[in-house]
Amino acid sequence: MTTHAAAPSTRVLIVDDSAAARAMFKVIVESDPALQVMAAVPDAFAAARAMRTELPDVILLDLELPGMDGLTFLRKIMQQHPIPVVVCSSHVGAGTEAMVSALELGAREVISKPAARNDLERQEASIRICDAIRAATETTRRRSQPEPRPLAPGPKLTADEILPARPPRPVPETMPVVCIGASTGGTEALRDVLTALPASAPPIVIVQHMPRGFTAAFARRLDSLCAIEVLEAEDEMQVMPGRAIIAQGDRHLLLRRRNQGYRVSVLDGAYVCRHRPSVDVLFRSAAQEAGGNALGVIMTGMGDDGARCMAEMRAAGAETIAQNEESCVVYGMPREAVAHGGVGKVEPLDRLAARIMEFGRRHTERTVR
């Protein structure tokens, strides 16, 4: 009889100065049969001692540590042992600059510590943390997407919770608008795309899965690097050429048509595809409000957020592009969008900015004829 060895568990090193947080993370990590806690330690020095005998597959790191702060520890890890790191921090406000710095130093993901108020929120937070850990290992293994999660989560809500579906309707010619969705690996990928755009770029609206309180710092950092203006979304903010609007963390972002132009709506509401903001919500609003005036772009990320409603965009006449597998950190969301029939073209990351500009020129030429 042939026997098969069980797949090796992903070993996680938890580094957090709070005993309560370490205990919480230990329970969360061990709720996933594919993950195991290698050690849970209170500071960077204890983490270094643990790593002398065994290297973890992923480090779950808080930024606020005694002795050596989390950013210094992260910098040393990347210099000595480039192990995937997921930063899980309660930082908001001014501390989010440190979270942006963590990404620039090489952290694979930055997520918020859970502040769950009920069983459903605790379950959703647990799933997001385990997903981030699993996705971090995938960035090293370069597989197309992690295996389906063995947990049994509650029902995954669709965009219907925020914006009801409706059959495609004719939409008048307006200015062009680009809608982008990204998740794991998206912060670096978005920087590559946006910094390659000239100030004359068409209007851009973005959902990047991020924690609450983090997107303002992310937008400021991008704005300092780009020829275009990059802003965190505010309700009724005008969508205009040379401007990219990034969804607030923990709030949905919708596109709204106003005469020949667009504004954005910022909404609370249920998690959609286990995310808030959700790419599906943005893409559905683009299908309904912009139709053939829109370009949808789905980029690196784990899961299927955006896949269903990118197909709605395409059915409504929009052009659609997925980032190719080779240039994705995690080829999850683009793969699912292709599987749902929503993708017109597949392009590498370094071609996306050019494709955005080509779309803007084609649309302008079409409308002036």
From Swiss-Prot:
An example Gene Ontology biological process: chemotaxis
UniProt cross-references to Gene3D superfamilies, sorted A to Z: 3.40.50.2300, Methylesterase CheB, C-terminal domain
Pfam families: CheB_methylest (PF01339), Response_reg (PF00072)
SUPFAM superfamilies linked to this entry: CheY-like, Methylesterase CheB, C-terminal domain
PROSITE patterns: CHEB (PS50122), RESPONSE_REGULATORY (PS50110)
GO MF entry, a single one: protein-glutamine glutaminase activity
Post-translational modification: Phosphorylated by CheA. Phosphorylation of the N-terminal regulatory domain activates the methylesterase activity.
SMART domains linked to this entry: REC
Domain Response regulatory: 11-128
Cellular localisation: Cytoplasm
Domain CheB-type methylesterase as annotated: residue spans: 170-358
Enzyme class of the recorded protein, top EC level: hydrolase
Catalytic residue positions: 183, 209, 305
Catalytic activity: [protein]-L-glutamate 5-O-methyl ester + H2O = L-glutamyl-[protein] + methanol + H(+); L-glutaminyl-[protein] + H2O = L-glutamyl-[protein] + NH4(+)
Residue ranges of the region described as Disordered: 136-168
Family listed: Belongs to the CheB family.
Free-text function comment from the UniProt entry: Involved in chemotaxis. Part of a chemotaxis signal transduction system that modulates chemotaxis in response to various stimuli. Catalyzes the demethylation of specific methylglutamate residues introduced into the chemoreceptors (methyl-accepting chemotaxis proteins or MCP) by CheR. Also mediates the irreversible deamidation of specific glutamine residues to glutamic acid.
Recorded domain comment: Contains a C-terminal catalytic domain, and an N-terminal region which modulates catalytic activity.
Protein name: Protein-glutamate methylesterase/protein-glutamine glutaminase 1
